[in-house]
Curated annotation (Swiss-Prot):
Binding positions for Mg(2+) per the UniProt entry: K206, D208, E209
Gene Ontology MF terms in the entry: magnesium ion binding; monooxygenase activity; ribulose-bisphosphate carboxylase activity
Protein name per Swiss-Prot or TrEMBL: Ribulose bisphosphate carboxylase large chain
Residues involved in substrate binding: N128, T178, K182, R299, H331, S383
Residues forming the catalytic site: K180 (proton acceptor), H298 (proton acceptor)
Gene: cbbL
Purpose: RuBisCO catalyzes two reactions: the carboxylation of D-ribulose 1,5-bisphosphate, the primary event in carbon dioxide fixation, as well as the oxidative fragmentation of the pentose substrate. Both reactions occur simultaneously and in competition at the same active site.
Annotated organism of origin: Xanthobacter flavus
GO BP terms: reductive pentose-phosphate cycle
Cofactor note: Binds 1 Mg(2+) ion per subunit.
Catalytic activity as recorded in UniProt: 2 (2R)-3-phosphoglycerate + 2 H(+) = D-ribulose 1,5-bisphosphate + CO2 + H2O; D-ribulose 1,5-bisphosphate + O2 = 2-phosphoglycolate + (2R)-3-phosphoglycerate + 2 H(+)
Residue list for modification N6-carboxylysine: K206
Amino acid sequence: MGADAAIGQIKDAKKRYAAGVLKYAQMGYWDGDYQPKDTDILALFRVTPQDGVDPVEAAAAVAGESSTATWTVVWTDRLTAADMYRAKAYKVEPVPGQPGQYFCWVAYELDLFEEGSIANLTASIIGNVFSFKPLKACRLEDMRLPVAYVKTFRGPPTGIVVERERLDKFGRPLLGATTKPKLGLSGKNYGRVVYEGLKGGLDFVKDDENINSQPFMHWRDRFLYCMEAVNKAQAETGEVKGHYLNITAGTMEEMYRRADFAKELGSVVVMVDLIVGWTAIQSISNWCRENDMLLHMHRAGHGTYTRQKGHGISFRVIAKWLRLAGVDHLHTGTAVGKLEGDPMTVQGYYNVCREDVTRTDYTRGIFFDQDWAGLRKVMPVASGGIHAGQMHQLIDLFGEDVVLQFGGGTIGHPDGIQAGAIANRVALETMILARNEGRDIKNEGPEILVEAAKWCQPLRAALDTWGEVTFNYASTDTSDFVPTASVA
């Protein structure tokens, strides 16, 4: 859509650099003939221009304000390789079914970015343009990160393959639960919840995002009681177990102190929240790599900027940044649970985490091929409002390289925490066996679970309690190309 002639890129240097105000397209931030290089960082924005603002000019403004431009001509541009360093909007298309919205593609020269720094990347790409007055709204939908850039990052400290080898668990999803209530328990009672869940068959139990070090339970007490529970459950079951010890704190120094104590106690995993920021995430990732620890990422706060379709950042972009930054586990949605998540869109997030090369797939919201250049894979985590009665849907949607995390669906079991864990483990093992036997678990799943429940009282009680519970609401973030329905 549009071309240089539509607005008129000024080629004459005297006119281009004369003092005053020019349109962004006139300054060279629009080039409809540009062919992206393999080394370019590419970004796809969804923009909603103000009334009367040409979409090509809006795209050029995004390119300019996220690279080298300001509101007026500055002569110091001539002291730089300005033609190279300018980001270039090179394509604009209307968003299907969304009047007034446009997709715009922008290419960035690799030299604009510091190697190995998500903080620097985000400072450019999202640092300024989202407040720009000529746009009613702006959303970063997807990015293509060139191999040359990807190779400057270390990625996940452990990765899926090595994690499974350390745990000695193969051929099935991993099982987890979040301790409930998330706040208010004493350290001793908290540890009891962890033990009961692990003893019943879970692989992991986790701290929730906001349990740090509060008056009712100091972080050190939590760590001690949780690791006592982990060690006891491991000894009794013969399986490797873990608890995601949340080391999120007010300073990096305190986070390192908590991480060191977790290691001293023998933990295999620590956890941080997304809200600690990109520099902290990369720093803790480096610590985990050096100390042979898994890093679990809770995406606390992401919905403030990922959920709305018109403005913010798609979670697929956040997932790409986190794979570069280096996390081993990432909450990526359930599609069937209580939290926002269109099934096809969520599958796209999983693809970003687990594939060697993520291929363009408009139905799942993926606009670019992404070669991960051998970067380790992230284990997705499905968490939030899921229960044993949905086991067939979860495995059908997400396969086996995933952590299925049943918090309330374990701890809320009418016969107790251990019974809740048993119900989930039996449902999981039953569904994997049925899948391996060639059964159609998507359609036969409820029948398979009911049959298994005849021999497992905890599973029967779980199905009786939650079997009909669904969260069947329309998703707000869906593909613009293929309408999809909830699976619940």
